[in-house]
Amino acid sequence: MLFNSYVFIFCFLPIVLAGYALLRRGSNLLWPVGWLVLASLVYYAWWRPEFLLLLLFSITVNFGFGTLIIDGGLSRAQSRAILTIGIVFNLCLLGYFKYAGFFVANVDSILGLQWAVPSIVLPIGISFITFQKIAFLVDAHRGLVRNFTLLNYAFFVTFFPQLIAGPITHHSEIMPQIGPSQRRDLAADIAVGMSIFVVGLFKKVVIADSLAVYADAGYATVKAGHPLDSASAWVTVLSYSFQLYYDFSGYSDMAVGLARMFGFQLPVNFYSPYKSTSIIDFWRRWHITLSRFLRDYLYIPLGGNRHGTLRRYLNLGIVMLLGGLWHGANWTFVIWGGLHGLMLTVNHAWRALPVSRSLAFKTRLADRVAVLVTFTAVTLAWVLFRSETLADAKAMFAYLWPMTADPMGWPSFKGLLRTQFTDLRYALTLTEWFRPRELWPAILPPDYLATATRPMGLLLVGVGIATFAMPNTYQIFGRFKPALGLPEETLGSGILRRLDWRVAIIVAGMFLLAVLRLSHVSPFLYYQF
Amino acid sequence: MIESGYLRALVLSLAAWLSLYLIFTWTIDPYGVSPIRLEFPRINALKPKRTDIDRILKPYEVWRYQPRTIFLGTSRANQSLDPSTLDGTRFAPAYNAAIPGGASMKMHAAYLEQYLRLDHNLRTVIVELFLPHMVGGPTPTWADFIGNTVSLFASANTLWDSLATLAYNAVSGRPIHQIERAGYFYHPNRPDPKTLFERFPSYIWSAAVHQPDRATFDQAAFDGALEIIQIARANNLELIFLIGPSHPYPDYYYDAIGAWGVIEEWLTKLSALATVYSFSQPNGWVDEPISPHMTYWYDTFHYSLAMGRGMLRSLAGAPTSGLPDNFMERLTPDRVASNIERRRAAVRRWAEANPSLVAQFEEARRKWLASEKTSH
């Protein structure tokens, strides 16, 4: 079940919220927490019920490990051994479901063993759930776990707002909230949570999904072996860059908003990453809880920055390579991770140079250039993230390079400028705007995305302005303490001072647009007589 | 601070926005489906967005209008058969439910089943046969019907297309192509047919057509036709298959790839099982000379509304004048061979009279065959 689906918005959420409101009236915490666990299991089982058994099995085994570590009276060494077994168990589950096919395919291609590549369906959210459980076991071993019961643990793992795609939470962040959440003003939490959820839904459904059509068309063209001109290639990669941004930002907002409706605060996971002035800054703003997990449970155990500069860079590289692999079982993700590791290393090396601290690099202009450079680097790296094969990525990089005078190179940008911006006969022909089709033609002309998909240019400019110039959700709702881990200045200076009828009008309008966007009238492009 | 009435304001605002949305989209009505049906010149009379959405729109309109007769077919039937021609005949009211672009026999069968559930007034179904299209295609489901109908009334596209419709009517106001109320496609500004005829060789011998050099009997497609016959019999429907007019140029193509045997096999088998009328006989209308202004042809494959009116009036037995004597012919198994022989002879005559078109065709074919040989 997706957050951006009719069934979730109009059935699941109202029922769960109503049940929760009723059950929390009593004094027994078991009922509301149990209700949320039950709802979360239904939510998880919606896609493929058989994976619920896997989730329950994994919860039971991890609860056993946790009980042994916390209440087993074990020595430090014994506790460490149980922790190791627990981590191996969780990684084996993840490895089997996510990486077995990748591993077999690669061994087979290297050794030519003619192995059959297994086709294993990936249980939804397993990457996040695995990290969450590993984090719990490590915290248990470190003595950081309180209020440890089966119900609480099941709630911590399965709480549906963060079950499928994070944020990856610590036990210590969620457990202390269970008691107080029952005493909070539910109506106020619903008001704040619903408003944040709607903002996230709007970002995901209206912005990200609109851009996805064009990004998908461009990448599909390249995958089919057909050329793109440079302008269309840039339209494709920029569309994807902003699509991914608003997809993840929207999802994170929805998760935070949903949790808040039930009185819980999740950690902040996304904080205007495209406003970063460096790659280091980017990873402090993009998927913050993953970066935190990798830092706390991989980078620091590897030695972090405690063993000299070279070792630090090596550790960074290892962490980012594994971080890349965590995103998907494909060499494109590994190389994407490696590339970010390399960029982080260069960034750290640059910061170590005295010249980087000169006043020339502290100006507003320098900051803006740094934001542009960082955004460009991140956007180009997304080519690897989005391409299905390294060959597709290579082809896309080649199309992005405009240094030729033929129509596929620099001149293609003239066509883009003319049709999208300067020639009003094209740019303002309203009936020809926004025509995402049911099926793209088998072969798109190379300049199709740059010239025919109007007003793609205006859309990208609008989204760019929104991304770089507007405040983020937390800066808007900061005064309502929407998430954990926000900077103090954000909490104190949120743009919205009060939720009143004016905000209600805007939020309701965004909600209606988003819900309407869930349904499509998709024209069919007749490409064959 | 959260005002005490915030949630109530949220609900009321949502109701207000929704009301505005409904008033606006039902008034502008970009897809012509509004329950209130208001039409204002320079505001919403022209519907530029009521196009390319046949698969979404037509099941809904069949359910809404409950026609007695429906047409199934591809873009030929869609562009050229105006159901109002049948007004006053036993077939009325009729609706053109043809789906352009890749419609197959299997798809027609699935749509027919759906239409039988949606339309309790249905008595006759007229199915266009177009031989190159007897391939697979998506089939409709109930979930599609519900999802598509919801999308016509409640989607961001509806809002956007309402704005586009309003802008087009206010700014341009020129007649534009759209699906007419009875389901057929009307294009007021057709391009010069001669140019389109001249493009035929480069189109047919290109990657846009799957295996253009082959013609084999497609059993799955024929099974689709059998399925349509079974559905019609089981539901006591009158079923008529139409062989639409075929210009000598595409007939030359069928001749060149040796397709006559397949066509004969199809028609012989089908005419033994169902009523089949052919409009492909060579005559003054079908063989109209290619020129920039043609009366009976829009392009190589698409015959005109004038031709379509003649077909429907002939079919309904309505009084007609000026039609060629052999315009409509009922095919029976014993008549198929002679019908095809007449077409073949006409093609050869046409080829002799049009050497430049034949040369263009053969040059495109030679290039395609050479490129195929290289790629293999």
Language model region names:
Chain B
Residues 44-71:
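Short extracytoplasmic
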Residues 66-156:
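Membrane-embedded segments
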Residues 124-131, 138-235, 326-376:
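Secreted/periplasmic serine-hydrolase-like ester/acetyl group-modifying domain
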Residues 261-369:
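C-terminal regions of proteins
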